Amino acid sequence: MGEWVIGAFINIFGSVAINFGTNLLKLGHNERERLALQDGGGKMPLKPIIHNQTWRVGILVFLLGNCLNFISFGYAAQSLLAALGSIQFVSNIAFAYVVLNKMVTVKVLVATAFIVLGNVFLVAFGNHQSPVFTPEQLAEKYSNVTFLVYCGILILIVAVHHFLYRKGEVLISTPGQEISSYWKMLLPFSYAVVSGAIGSCSVLFAKSLSNLLRLAMSSSYQLHSWFTYSMLLLFLSTAGFWMTRLNEGLSLYDAILIVPMFQIAWTFFSICTGCIYFQEFQVFDALRTTMFILGMMCVFIGISLLAPDDTRGNETKDNSSSLDSIVSSSVPTEEDRLIPQSSEDGHSKDTRVVVQGMYMKAADLIAKTKTACLAALGFGEDSINASAILVMPMVSSKITGFRGNGLERAKILSMRGSGWSKLAMEEEGTRMLEKTISSKA
């Protein structure tokens, strides 16, 4: 049995464990909310989720799955494992049905069939080699002309889509400007492409680290080297970027659009990066290339079919729009808050308010960054079904939807529309600020 088979099985078990863990995390949050309703009628504050036994088991299974996926990259090709990670969608359906008692529709079954069929093609015709590289060989591959050209193209793609995204933001923020359906589709697409292109590099660095770990176990190679630490730093940076963009993107856009875009972009760039860097395409002939591409198309079709219902997305969007208007009308703008109470000490009060506002803004950004990093591990007040860094996170499906609540989305949209000049503060922060102004008046 080839080593690629071992890597494939480890990856499958890891993906299944990740999905089982995330469903247990979701179940733990549901149990906590149900107990809060039973004990205090929903008025009592929720206990920390870490006290829930189901959640603790879920986080252990989740971490075990991530470790298995990390190990698997040392035994099989990146292009194979990146595509094979889509098997988690199949296991998620089964676990959501058994653990969360969710309904499985015909559309979900059809999507599952496409994903399974695509994975059969990918496994049968993918790269079956699993060589172990030395640090010198890995470093040499980073200076390969083909890989450098690919990196240049990748940077160009990221720059173009980032420019388009910023241009679209300017058009949206312009008062009275009509936004065409073209820009409404291009904005989330550009956001997903930038996120997937950079975030998928975490798979490359993870495979390099896994390769070094495997080399250290089979020889006298010492992990204590500049190359190992460089790979670790790059992995943490790209993985952190991916998780942050993933969390933010799901709060900004309807899941029916952004979910399949995220998943397809991440998988596509992960496969391309592995094929170019490790030169995995060299073993492909015309037949294997055709069947591998066909398998990828089947997987992408299946992922697209797993997007949430349009009706559900519209309902959420309508609710978000109404909440956005509520938040916008209830939270005073910066200009309203910074009106001086008197002409004598207006300047000093204005300065104090601005300084306090800047401080609260910085604290809010730090809190959001911390939340984004911990969200994928299930920590925090809200359950988030992000599954892994090394495989495409199971962020949303018809079974276990992953969307920020409407109030969070409204706050973010309000902040994005107002810009830096208008400080977007939470309600508690606003009350504290107004109280400070009145006490010093």
Swiss-Prot record:
Keywords: Cell membrane, Endosome, Ion transport, Magnesium, Membrane, Transmembrane, Transmembrane helix, Transport. It is a multi-pass membrane protein. The chain crosses the membrane at residues 5-25, 57-77, 80-100, 106-126, 145-165, 185-205, 223-243, 256-276, 289-309. Residues 320-330 have a biased composition (Low complexity). The keyword Chloroplast does not apply. It is found in: Cell membrane; Early endosome. Disulfide bonds: none annotated. Residues 334-347 have a biased composition (Basic and acidic residues). GO terms for molecular function: magnesium ion transmembrane transporter activity. One of its GO terms (biological process) is magnesium ion transport. Residues 313-347 are annotated as: Disordered. GO terms for cellular component: early endosome; plasma membrane. It comes from the Eukaryota. Residues 26-56, 101-105, 166-184, 244-255, 310-441 are cytoplasmic. Belongs to the NIPA (TC 2.A.7) family. PANTHER family: MAGNESIUM TRANSPORTER NIPA8-RELATED (PTHR12570:SF9), PTHR12570. Homodimer. This is Probable magnesium transporter NIPA8. It comes from Arabidopsis thaliana (Mouse-ear cress).
